[in-house]
Amino acid sequence: MAKIYVDGKAYCMSESDNLLQACLSSGLNIPYFCWHPILGSLGACRQCAVTQYNSSLDNQGKLIMSCMTPVIDGTIISINDDTSKKFRSNIVELLLTNHPHDCPVCEEGGNCHLQDMTVMTTHNFRNYRFSKRTHKNQYLGSFIKHEMNRCIGCYRCVRYYRDYADGTDLDVYGANNNIYFGRIEHGVLENEHSGNLIEICPTGVFTDKTHSKKYNRKWDMQYAPGICQNCSIGCNISIGERYGEIRRIENRYHESINHYLICDLGRFGYSHTNLKNRPKKPILSTKENDVNILNFNKAIEYATNFFQRYKNVIGVGSIRSSIENNFALQELVGKENFCNGMSDKENSCIKLILDTLKNNQLYIPSLKEIESYDTILILGEDLTQTAPRIALAVRQAMKNKAKDLAELYGIPKWNAAPISQISEIYKNYLYIFNTHETKLDNIADWSYFSSIDNQVRFARAIAYELDKNLPDISFLDSNLRKKASLIAKKIISSKKVLIISGSHVYSKSIIQASINIAISINQKNINHVGLTFVTSSSNTLGLGILGGFSIENALKKLKNREAEAIIFMEYDLYRYISKHDCDVLFKKNDNIMSIDHQYTQTYKNSGFALPSVNFTESSGTIVNFEGRAQRFFQVYDPMFYDKKNCLYVSWKWLSFIKSKIEKKEISWINLDNIISEYSDKYPIFKKIKTAGPNASFRVHGQKIARSPHRSSGRTALRANINIHEPSQPKDADTMFSFSMEGYSQPNKSISHIPFAWFPGWNSPQAWNKFQKEIGRQLISGDSGVHLFKSNKKILDIYFHFSPKKFIKEKYWYVIPYYHIFGNEELTQYSSIIKQNIPLEYVLISELDGLELGLKKNSIVEFNCLNQDFRLPIRLSKHLTSKHIGLPIGRKGFPISLIGEKVKSLWEVMS
């Protein structure tokens, strides 16, 4: 630590930071534009000027750019001297020369870094009286609105998009005072993290188009700290609501997970929560297919009779639902009748992953820690599509070699320009094993494209090269053996090695192979090894801990009359099982019950159905890919806006039914009650109570406010329904209040922050004030709690199996392919996401296409699982012959297709 004197006061600052970052970490305010914690320093905007003095006797000093100045012990600077203040005010005035006077109509207003910095520099009068240069705006897709006339030329957008996220279709054009940031031509931004431009840009050049359609100022929305439900990463998000609709999702800072960035699916994939056509009241279908709407009491009475009428009711849980909901279902039907809803293949994969997390000492890194590895192997996962934020972390890991080299030459890590140039030449090592092309191939040292079986064989060869005690690999051809040896040598010479695998290809063998490589590295005891498993949904691991049998076993029990009825909780059977088998089951539906917040095919076909609430309308806990339990919180009460609705979180419905059956008082009054019960019954959940404060938590006797203190129009929220203002809803489950009344400032006790605001800091840059140091941990520490402990003893138990060589057959073998938009279940109901879902197609190899005389977009037909398919084809250079890729997870493409065999496919002439 260095001692720095600022305006006559001494501060201890980190010598690894630049002066701007160090001052901000110390709570001092220096205006800035081009600098950003994840982008480093460029010195382009000249806004962060301060005066530096040679000694205490120096009265003149010199202006320096604090973002480009290292922290050196004994440095004397002034932020508030007249020279610095006047210079910074003049810079703002120059930057505003061509900026329009449109704050009242600008969507960034009240959430704008430019506004904050203009106020901070006390600039309030413009001397420029001439014409402003104007630009034409571009169409950038359905997510982002472009308003180029607001640009101040800070270069943040291209530095993030091109240098950080590796996007290629956004650049800077022009020169001098006439530069343009955009695409070569109109078109959708191609990068999966393009939405972060909205928060990276300090002005209103890039704004949220989904928010524009129903716009509210930041201070007029109600917020809650949420967890993204779209993949297994568990990114922290801030969810904003107004008039009973989710209006916006922003990144919520978490040092160990998403940091400052989230993917586009997490940011824009929320409109399914606002659907008007959603279940709102309990329904009962009659034999004549009539639908009767029930009130609350009738619904509970019928549900009670349902469980009394049928013996051994199977309860099907859901990977997209919270631990609380799944536990409540398990308690109602009993452990022996609890189905986790996963397929046989996924169930075995998740059991293996959980056993590894529970029993092994292999290190499971956080998302942020992934960036620190210098060699990464990805086995079987197309990360850009299945876990985009991890893919972005892998890209940063590849660039970190440049930072290490820069350090050798005395270049600090925050100096962006030279490091960016070095990273073009020197990168860390990345090896990818997949069935077909991925978007990370462009940064990989080598990509191995082959069948799953062949990937497992090659992974086994690498493990053998690391530990010769393993069985010989004579089965592998000489070229692949040489490649395996080369990769093993790179691994041995690395400081930190990461193996990434997962369950998306539904292969237990490939997970075992990845574990074997990690163990063989660990045996060397010369370098650090990490292991990351990507799973299919937000709470796959949480549900896996509760146990239960697969969906195939559940249907088998029904068929064999070992069970008489079934209840689906937030689960669509049509996503997992063929349409033919589902239709057979639903022919007689009076023994089928469903609880959900979407009109899924399962919900529609059930004999009795209860409407639940989605994740924005409820609070609960989920477990992410690293075994971190995280709490998400209710944003608003949907029944506040319409008392006629009968909407409850699933665990409350199940609690009402359970108490009625047992003729007892309701045991789970609030969220704390049910958390306490399952944490007692499952020792692994013992620490989960600390994942978030309980409902009685207060700061200075106050609950935490969900709304900013400037929130307006509360008395008019329901005036169109009733002019009499009702009292605000009471939240018995959490420490938050449904209003602006309550605590909202940085505090050592609060890590679940609904929204980022601090006096003078209205934009997302306000997160600076909630951190111990800029870009590092929150004042209160990271939220969430790790459920698994790592053992210190070295693991030496390998998985022994004989991977089969893929033999070309006369049948076609079905494999999955994924797209970021369209494979996750709930976002397929989102209107804005539907516009961005690629058309469905069949993926086959170019070799097979040539053999069959097929070209791109030729229409083919085939039959699988008693279902006919008719789709255009796409040709892959790398896909193994006789493999057929299908968009698993899309409507009409159930998970049960994976691994099935197709006898033949034929072209349909149009």
From Swiss-Prot:
Q: Which PROSITE patterns does the entry mention?
A: 2FE2S_FER_2 (PS51085), 4FE4S_HC3 (PS51839), 4FE4S_MOW_BIS_MGD (PS51669), COMPLEX1_75K_1 (PS00641), COMPLEX1_75K_2 (PS00642), COMPLEX1_75K_3 (PS00643)
Enzyme Commission number(s) of this protein: 7.1.1.-
Annotated 4Fe-4S His(Cys)3-ligated-type domain ranges read: 83-122
Binding-site residues, [4Fe-4S] cluster 2:
151, 154, 157, 201
Annotated ranges, domain 4Fe-4S Mo/W bis-MGD-type: 221-277
What does the record say about how the cofactor binds?
Answer: Binds 1 [2Fe-2S] cluster per subunit. Binds 3 [4Fe-4S] clusters per subunit.
Designated name of the protein: NADH-quinone oxidoreductase subunit G
User: Which organism is this entry from?
Assistant: Buchnera aphidicola subsp. Schizaphis graminum (strain Sg)
